[in-house]
Amino acid sequence: MSDKRRYFGTDGVRGKVGQYPITPDFVLKLGWAAGRVLAKQGTRKVIIGKDTRISGYMLESALEAGLAAAGLKATFTGPMPTPAVAYLTQTFRAEAGIVISASHNPYYDNGIKFFSYEGTKLPDDIELAIEAELDKDIECVESAELGKASRMVDAAGRYIEFCKSTFPSKLSLSGLKLVVDCANGATYHIAPNVFRELGAEVIAMGVEPNGLNINDQVGATDVRALQKRVVEEHAHLGLAFDGDGDRIIMVDHLGNKVDGDQIAYIIARDALRRGELKGGVVGTLMTNLGMENGLKQLGIPFVRAAVGDRYVMEKLLEKGWKIGAENSGHVILLDKVTTGDAIVAGLQVLASVVGSEMTLHELAKGMTLYPQVLENVRFAGDNNPLEADAVKAAVSEVEAELGSKGRVLLRKSGTEPLIRVMVEGEDETLVKQSALKIAQAVKDNC
């Protein structure tokens, strides 16, 4: 079996709807291939959730057909955050969980990602086994062994109660005014209820999904509307989730953005204050230098993993630590959950706000963010601009200018045809100029 993935990226199979591999016929076969592999594992039961994209209906049906042909039973949750599917997979003792979502991407993209029976990303060997099955022709099991489908009617209520259980029982959100932006995505019927039931006054936005407006000028990838609303409503803070509820960005009462690095810092510092910190914090190559320095001042260990929440998870398991994050808003808290969970992460920050009697603004000021500029350059074809001599020369020049007061990172996106150029340092003007210089070199060599 080849150890090179053809379809699975860093976060499952993803692409534009109607274009291979996000087509009904491929997804049907993917369901069958996954079913063939999972049927060998045990229960033959799979939990399937989705976000609010209009294409979710089509892909859900295709998956169901493929799984049934392989003899697996599918239980559908309807629109449900990705971490909720991970949780329900565990609690129902299912063989796997499947999420139909393209996370923070626009509505015209979609994807399929899998969770193991433990609520974690599938192991590499299972993904490779599924890919191997995709090369075969579909063979139905005998009619008497075909899988059935059912719907889980209380999925939302179960997950709401789970989220609330991660908030300290002695604390309440009473007296807090929150603006909650659900990105017109999978948290729209979950998150506002979680915070309300814990006592907060909630102003909800991004809670009117129509299949086409997921992540559209709302949510964790675009917090401008949230920033404006928090200030207008004189709210204590705002929380923004992405389309599938595994990313969170927060906004303080002044309208300042609080990203994944700052959120992880606040959670780690609060755990240290309570004497409950287990180990250190895992970030990524994109994590701001300010977070690393802020944690160092507190005596909290910090290491970087490759970009992608699966690599953060791998490093956490390797180190035996509990807190990991990406600045984009993936926050993994292994003492609470098995994967990135935006609502649960938000609740831990709120617990810090209430428990310390400090504002989010005050808590976030504990670390100083270095200016960081990210440029995305789209490319096509099989050429790798990162190998071009002109690009390497531009990087060398910038690194020499920044010296020890900054850093450069170039990488290919794991989910889109993009080269990501990141420059970080103390001098904001120099950082901006440097990022544009490298991005132009990449464009010229695409």
From Swiss-Prot:
GO annotations of cellular component type: cytosol
Post-translational modification: Activated by phosphorylation.
InterPro entries: A-D-PHexomutase_a/b/a-I, A-D-PHexomutase_a/b/a-I/II/III, A-D-PHexomutase_a/b/a-II, A-D-PHexomutase_a/b/a-III, A-D-PHexomutase_C, A-D-PHexomutase_C_sf, A-D-PHexomutase_CS, Alpha-D-phosphohexomutase_SF
Residues with Phosphoserine modification: 103
Single Gene Ontology MF annotation: phosphoglucosamine mutase activity
Reactions catalysed, as given in the entry: alpha-D-glucosamine 1-phosphate = D-glucosamine 6-phosphate
A Pfam family annotated for this UniProt entry: PGM_PMM_I
Keywords: Isomerase, Magnesium, Metal-binding, Phosphoprotein
GO biological process: carbohydrate metabolic process; peptidoglycan biosynthetic process; UDP-N-acetylglucosamine biosynthetic process
Cofactors, names only: Mg(2+)
Keyword Isomerase: yes
UniProt KW Metal-binding keyword: yes
Residues holding Mg(2+): 103, 242, 244, 246
Known EC number: 5.4.2.10
Family: Belongs to the phosphohexose mutase family.
Function (record text): Catalyzes the conversion of glucosamine-6-phosphate to glucosamine-1-phosphate.
UniProt-listed PANTHER family: PHOSPHOGLUCOMUTASE (ALPHA-D-GLUCOSE-1,6-BISPHOSPHATE-DEPENDENT), PHOSPHOHEXOSE MUTASE
NCBIfam families registered for this protein in UniProt: glmM, PRK10887.1
Protein name, entry field: Phosphoglucosamine mutase
Organism listed in the record: Vibrio cholerae serotype O1 (strain ATCC 39315 / El Tor Inaba N16961)
